[in-house]
Amino acid sequence: MENIDMKYLHLLAKQYPTIAKTATEIINLEAIMNLPKGTEHFLSDVHGEYSAFEQVLRNGSGVVKRKIRDIFGDELDDAEINSLSTLIYYPEEKMDLIAEEMDDMHDWYRTTLFRLIELCQYVASKYTRSKVRKAMPEDFAYILEELLHENYNEEDKKMYYEEILQHIISLDRAAEFISALSRLIQQLVVDHLHIVGDVYDRGPYPDKIMDTLMNYHSLDFQWGNHDILWMGAASGSRVCAANVIRISARYLNLDILEDSYGISLRPLALFADEIYKNDPCTYFQPKNEDNLNYSKAEITQIARMHKAISIIQFKLEGEIINRRKEFDMNHRLLLQMIDYKKGTIHLKGKDYQLLDTHFPTIDPNDPYKLTKEEKELIEKITASFKNCRRLQKHVQFLYSKGSMFLTYNGNLLYHGCIPLYEDGTFMEMKLRGENFSGRELLEQFEILTREAYVRKPGTKEKKYACDIVWYLWTGAVSSLFGKSEMTTFERYFIAEKETHKEEKNPYYKLRNEETICKQILEEFGLDGECGHIINGHTPVKEGKGESPIKANTKMLVIDGGFAKAYHKETTLAGYTLLYNSYGLQLVSHQPFTTKEDAIKNETDILSTRQVIEMEINRKRVRDTDIGKNLNEQATDLKMLLEAYRNGSLHENS
């Protein structure tokens, strides 16, 4: 007792003023700690593909269907299991289809309600009543609690529950009740969601994904390289805004800016039509990967916009490189390496012919200087990003729930990499005059990313932080990028593929080694023997023999593969991860078709499970980070109880 601060116990006594209340809370905490660990669900690299993301989120990477098989495997055939699964994923839409095929829904409602209640009882069994109650929709909370926490086999209660269900059906509330049960099941099968980066990129609906995540019951977020670009644009970074628009134009995805976020691109269109009106912009034709129906005139205008914003981007990047010598990026000052008369560029000791030599806004004597019109344009565009309420709401959520890395239940989560030298030591970078590496480097990157958003506009601190955010997108020591350089200019203007090459950081080779992974885990304060690294960012090319499980299971690469462009390379849609009380399971997914197909034909994403690590003893809440906090609370309360019993403190009944 000598080491316990009595002031703290006095404060604790205000919340627990009696022996009875203190003892009750200790019992409650011990009971919670003995419950099975909740299921963690890991997703990465969603890339704006809302339909596939929604399906994986609703089915819990196959957890819902597995729970149905646990309960009804001997009672229902595969078709019935698929039908019940689809109902839980999309209750309203599925019931609409069923209602079209049935004249009388009464018996179907009754059977379905009983099945859903039984399933809900099963998935709720690992939680406290209090937690389940909080997850229930308010309208049905009382009835749900009655139905979920009683035994149907007791004859004296059976009729009571039959009557409840009969009234739900007769009062025409069965559909709403089924929807409520379905959503409750979805919520209870996954206790916590980890998004290991990149909601944003080339996909059309990152905004819908963000809306969904903002309504999710429990999650965290590790920022990805594409997320950081949008965060930078929302923070007021001109170069990040230019990059966002360039990528959107390249992949025919300007609708996300104009329709979803209300960011007007009319000033850019007018500027591009004027400056590049006689330019075919051949090498800036957008990629129409989804065969979208655009007219020739629309494609021509988008190509002009694409080129216009690209040139502005290259100029802005040159400005940053020139003022931030510590970024060590002089080799990326490409506009000054062009011979504008010959139409060539001198790179790494060799001259290359440029594919496009029409640069009406570039002054060869001062190539990084924006024209008056370009400057006005990028200021307008950046202001639109800053003033977009919906984007600001989404970015604020990314800041509030996100981080550069996360340690959680003994595992280390990050999107890109931990920058390493060839010998496996941590790469250093100088930030604000001081060298950082490893964990400290990522912590500094996070601090500066937050400063970019909150610092006052016009200050040197704001400008520096915004420049760092851009560096995180493209820099050699960025933990989000993980390559030596980003050869965007070369891909547009030089035919020779040798100039397009981007050398990966040694990390991507070294992460196959168990000793390196253990070293990284220990750098972040985790147990190298028990912990795992959960990494996104790089698609796993299974067709070429790559495996998502590396370094004797220390490294798990879970690029979700949602981006359709990578499906040919990977031969599947990617991976997600589950971590429940029984251990770690990697889930591989086949490509998703459509939501309509999933509902009508009851097609789910075909998933294959691979057990990575099976627990000998089932993990309990006490074995988790939350459990450690609960255990500390219980220890403090036991000290308080002892103080009451030995007379150090007196009860206040």
From Swiss-Prot:
Family designation: Belongs to the FBPase class 3 family.
Keywords: Carbohydrate metabolism, Hydrolase, Manganese
Cofactor needs: Mn(2+)
Organism in which the protein naturally occurs: Listeria innocua serovar 6a (strain ATCC BAA-680 / CLIP 11262)
UniProt-listed GO biological process terms: gluconeogenesis
Gene designation per UniProt: fbp
EC category: hydrolase
Catalytic activity: beta-D-fructose 1,6-bisphosphate + H2O = beta-D-fructose 6-phosphate + phosphate
EC number(s) on file: 3.1.3.11
Protein name listed in UniProt: Fructose-1,6-bisphosphatase class 3
The keyword Hydrolase is assigned to this record: yes
GO molecular-function terms, A-Z: fructose 1,6-bisphosphate 1-phosphatase activity
